[in-house]
């Protein structure tokens, strides 16, 4: 039990360390505010198609976009772009994406998710899709499976009455490979 709480404290220290480092990635004081906001909100929206209002309803999208760019440069978030064809890079939509957080452990800590409760059926049902998507995306990024551009992709169909999504697709030799 002690090691669990020590681990949670360590994760909290890492999150705090990121916050202290953000001024290094912010060219202006105004940027710092947006970087901090994006960093704080991203763990709560992992795996969801990104909407600027998920970060803030009161801040213009151009400022949030700048915060996303800076967080991505800092390596604390990673966009997963929608792509509708092959090759993925040629058919992706730079304005349609989801976000991954830096790390699954950090994500659960930032969200206040208690790992020891994951064995509870109700708790798992609520969070398992997000947790799985973060884990798989993180593994793809760590191992550089099937991508050269540094971009991750997903596929979705948004037709009325016929919605579908593949959380990740990578370039294969002759066709995209769903993950």
Q: Which residues fall in each region the model found?
A:
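Conserved beta3 VAIK motif of the Hanks protein kinase fold
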Residues: 179
